[in-house]
Every structure is written in C-alpha cells, then in structure tokens.
Amino acid sequence: LYVFAPYAIDLCVRQIFYVINMKKKDAIFVPIIISLSMIIPLAVAALMLFSNYLHINSKNDFSYLPLFHAILNGTTAILLTFGFILIKNKQSKLHKFVMISAFVLSSVFLLSYVFSKLVLDHETTKYLGEYVSTYRFILISHILLSLAVLPLALFSMYRGLTGEFEKHKNIVKWTFPIWM
C-alpha cells in the first residue's frame, strides 16, 4: 500500500485537473481556497467562543484527546520533515503522498481539537501554572500563525497539485516554517 498509494493519488489528481485548463482552474479553485481560509477560522473561533453554551455532556471519557492531539501534531511534523527530505532527493510522487498525508492529519487534528473543546471541562483544561505569561504568549502566537498557515497550506497544495512548481516553491518557503 505504501508503494502504491503515491501513484494512485498522483493518478487521481491528474484526472481531476486534466479536464480544466489553468485559467479556469484558478477561476474555480482560488475563490474556494480564499473562502475556506476565511470560513474555517471564523467557524472555529465561533465554536471556541461559544463552547460554554455548546458544551456536549457525555458519559464517555475523552481525557485521551490531548495525547491524541500531540500524536497527530508530532506525526505531522515528522511527515513535513520527511516530505522536505523527499523533494530535496527528487522523489516527487512520494513527496506528494507524504504532504497530502500531513494535511489530512492536520485536518483531523483541527476537527478533534474543536470537538475536545466541546466535550472537555474547560475549568480543568485551563493552564494555571507558574508560567502563565509564557503559556499565553505561545498560545496567542500559535493562534495567529495558524490563521496564516491555512491559506498558505491550501495554496501550496493547489500549486503543487496543478504542476505550478515555481509558484509552489515560492509559497512553500513561507508555509513550511509556519506549519512546523
């Protein structure tokens, strides 16, 4: 599966973009990317702001979610690094598979993180340790960078999948360090 998957993904992507020429692709996909880049953060912000009102009472134990999130983020970081190494070694098909996998894991993380805010007790998940200022600085910078990484990641993937490799390289120079 590991050997076959990059080729299957490559074939699917080529079929999707084959029927539309480049200008039509941009006319369709650029507005979609821009819209998603605005809608997703707004939806996440709304869910986070109103999570006290939207809290889901559940008898299930979701205390494993922070560990799950750490595993997702750690695996994503490994995949991003591996993808960087692959493209430096000119293994573009495997690079594409690894980067799409990293994007999928990041998407699963976002969905799971929002879900965790709806099911976990907020009073027990707030950080109240002696490094509150440091924690808040890291948290706020993380939130601001996450706003930038979504459109950058979407445009990076789009330019790479459509074969616009110069544009892809220019965007990835910003996307990679922010995403990491």
Model-derived features with residue positions:
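Aromatic (phenylalanine/tyrosine) cluster motif
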Residues: 2-7, 17-18
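Alpha-helical membrane insertion/targeting regions
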Residues: 17-180
